[in-house]
């Protein structure tokens, strides 16, 4: 049925010709083949080389279709391609297929934390590493064993998701999560900086995502947003750029690692406002109430040095809260002996 041969014949009976396609749950493309997995049959399929309409061509050549039965328990939860491998996930298993033709295709299975149910669309490749949501949190797979990258997040809020959607831009992993139903539904947009290992939570505007290589577009059900508006030539006419985004940064406890004969005598913050911003700097001593230290305003790009002398305490935390865009460039601590005199050097 490839159109290379034409024949005519007359038959008294009706002749039916069909080209069957397996009933598959998840698909991915790898090496000019479409790969898919079937939960009904527990089978992984590959189409004929370069022909996604032909799944049962077995002529003994390198372009043949391919199928293999897997022995792992449970349903498939996702599929992806990374570093030349076709990958198929279950919640506790990773199946990896590699090879150049059906005669040397090999299946390798690994018992590990796989893709969570309902999180098939969280799979996203960034800089040769595959990120996805597992039942235990967000994982990163670089070709060996998946490692957890979401230890800084509350694991309870990453479990039992209804749906998860992933996207990427400039080394950042965008993860949109939906948990619960109706009024109890909780929606979050998490962003992971893969180079710095930092997580942040952004305003939700991404029920759907699509990347173009140099931009990530997010659909909120009413409008399309660009993750980086500066890359859009006509963003000013769009009338929808976000400005004055609210932010809040709270540090961990400072001073718990100091020996008893030293105390924190001075703390200096160096801040840089990227755009028009309002900033409030506050401090909390020994987990007490927040006390405002300074309120800053920037009409554009500007740097601030905020020094202050903390009162004697066991530990303190500081908070940066405001609206706009702010970067904490450095944190300098100065310690002194209990009897006076500066001893320690700066620590950034």
Outline where the language-model segments fall.
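Generic detection of intrinsically disordered/low-complexity segments and helix-coil linkers/edges
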Residues: 3, 29, 49-52, 60, ...
């Amino acid at each position: 049925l490839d159109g290379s041969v034409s024949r005519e014949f007359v038959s008294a009976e009706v002749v039916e010709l069909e080209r069957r396609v397996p009933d598959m749950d998840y698909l991915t493309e790898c090496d000019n083949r479409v790969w898919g997995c079937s939960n009904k049959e527990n089978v992984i399929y590959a189409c004929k080389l370069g022909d996604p309409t032909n799944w049962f061509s077995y002529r003994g050549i390198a372009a043949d279709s391919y199928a293999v039965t897997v022995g792992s328990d449970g349903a498939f939860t996702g599929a992806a391609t990374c570093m030349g491998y076709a990958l198929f996930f279950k919640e506790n298993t990773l199946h990896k297929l590699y090879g150049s033709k059906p005669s040397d295709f090999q299946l390798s299975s690994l018992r590990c934390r796989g893709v969570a149910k309902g999180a098939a669309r969280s799979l996203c490749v960034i800089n040769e590493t595959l990120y996805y949501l597992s039942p235990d949190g967000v994982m990163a797979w670089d070709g060996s064993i998946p490692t957890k990258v979401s230890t800084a997040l509350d694991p309870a809020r990453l479990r039992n998701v209804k749906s998860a959607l992933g996207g990427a831009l400039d080394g950042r992993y965008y993860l949109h999560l939906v948990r619960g139903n109706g009024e109890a539904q909780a929606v979050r947009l998490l962003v992971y900086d893969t180079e710095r290992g930092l997580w942040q939570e952004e305003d939700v505007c991404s029920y759907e995502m699509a990347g173009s290589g140099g931009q990530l577009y997010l659909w909120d059900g009413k409008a399309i947003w660009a993750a980086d508006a500066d890359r859009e030539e006509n963003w000013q006419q769009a009338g929808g750029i976000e400005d004055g985004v609210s932010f809040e940064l709270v540090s961990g406890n400072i001073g718990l690692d100091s020996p008893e004969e030293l105390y924190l005598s001075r703390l200096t913050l160096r801040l840089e406002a990227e755009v028009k911003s309002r900033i409030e700097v506050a401090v909390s001593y020994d987990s007490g109430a927040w006390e405002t230290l300074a309120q800053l305003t920037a009409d554009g790009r500007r740097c601030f040095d905020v020094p202050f002398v903390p009162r004697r305490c066991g530990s303190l935390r500081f908070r940066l809260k405001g609206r706009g865009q702010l970067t904490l460039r450095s944190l300098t601590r100065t310690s002194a002996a209990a009897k006076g005199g500066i001893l320690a050097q700066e620590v950034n």
